[in-house]
UniProtKB/Swiss-Prot annotation:
This is High osmolarity signaling protein SHO1A. Belongs to the SHO1 family. SUPFAM superfamilies: SH3-domain (SSF50044). The gene is SHO1A. It holds the Pfam family SH3_1. Keywords: Cell membrane, Glycoprotein, Membrane, SH3 domain, Stress response, Transmembrane, Transmembrane helix. One of its GO terms (biological process) is regulation of actin filament polymerization.
Length: 321
């Protein structure tokens, strides 16, 4: 399934900056606040330590680097674009973790209180970096991410319909989309059937003469009525073994009746989904709802709800149980 969902913070990077995404998410609010506090402690302590004695230049670079990392994480969360940039975020955080831990090692053993305070700020930055790497580096379907995201207000809304642009060839055949050819028996055709095999030519079978075509359809002026010797008897046509051999098989016969769909799998909705009103095949479901699934090979799964409603659902909204 195309995995760019607003639910995971994947609005394609085009969402506007909204502080409500941070305020409404306790995890993001707490970690960004701790990271900002740790950076301020390290920055102020570094200035004081640099006045009294020499300060490692490497730690200044670590401070500048982590400043932009915190800004980047804040922007990604506020713009609801975490899923779009989560790979880059994990990479930058991993490099920042190396910088902050190295700064801690170069400052923590000094007797100067300012340098020790700066080391404490870098320790806070290192701890937040580890938490962010574990969170942003995990799949949205991970249990710890689902637990954390359940406290966020904005992550309970229905995502954008970008996932509906999936290739329709992956959609399973349903009763709404499948179209069966209409079949008629000889009694319904009432003389309009032909004994020649149908080849797709508008005049009937290839090589058919004009006389044969004229016998099937009366010429104009006769009102479309058949004479007594031209109109076949429907009962005789049905009882004739030759006509039974030629007439197409009716859809109501047991051999062509569509077998009921089986649902051997069970899936849990990790997020709510609202069906497209223009597509009668889709179904809506709520977060944590249990669905029965018949096929899990494509991007769209044939699913059945507890109330008996059936339809297709995007696979990236479901997780198999």
């Amino acid at each position: 399934m195309d995995y760019n969902n607003n639910r995971y913070g994947g609005g394609g990077g085009g969402s506007k900056f909204n502080l409500g995404h941070i305020v409404g998410d306790p995890f993001s609010l707490a970690t960004i606040a701790i990271a900002t506090a740790g950076w301020l402690i390290a920055f102020v302590s570094s200035i004081i330590a640099n006045i009294d004695q020499e300060y490692p230049n490497y730690s200044w670079w670590a401070l500048a680097y982590m400043f932009f990392v915190i800004l980047g994480v804040t922007f990604a969360v506020a713009a609801n674009a975490v899923y779009t940039y989560h790979v880059a975020m994990v990479g930058f955080l991993a490099a920042g973790l190396v910088f902050t831990t190295s700064s801690v090692n170069s400052l923590i053993y000094w007797s100067d209180k300012a340098k020790q305070a700066a080391a404490a700020g870098f320790i806070l930055l290192s701890m937040v970096s580890i938490v962010w790497i574990f969170y942003f580096g995990s799949q949205p379907t991970a249990s710890h991410r689902q637990t954390i995201d359940s406290f966020a207000l904005h992550k309970d809304h229905a995502p954008s319909r970008a996932s509906r642009h999936m290739t329709q060839s992956y959609r399973p055949e349903t009763t709404h989309s499948a179209q069966h050819p209409q079949m008629y028996n000889s009694s319904q055709l009432a003389g309009f059937e032909t004994s020649s095999p149908v080849t797709g030519y508008p005049g009937g079978a290839a090589g058919a003469t004009k006389r044969e075509s004229a016998s099937a359809f009366p010429p104009p002026g006769q009102g479309g009525n058949f004479s007594n010797n031209q109109q076949p008897n429907p009962i005789t046509s049905q009882n004739n073994p030759q006509n039974q051999h030629q007439q197409p098989q009716d859809l109501t016969s047991p051999s062509t009746t569509q077998q009921p769909t089986e649902y051997p799998y069970r899936a849990k909705a990790i997020y709510s989904y609202e069906a497209n009103p223009d597509d009668a095949n889709e179904i809506s479901f709520n977060k944590h709802e249990i669905l029965e699934v018949s096929d899990v090979s494509g991007r769209w799964w044939q699913a059945k709800k507890e109330n008996g409603e059936t339809g297709i659902a995007p696979s990236n909204y479901l997780i198999l149980l």
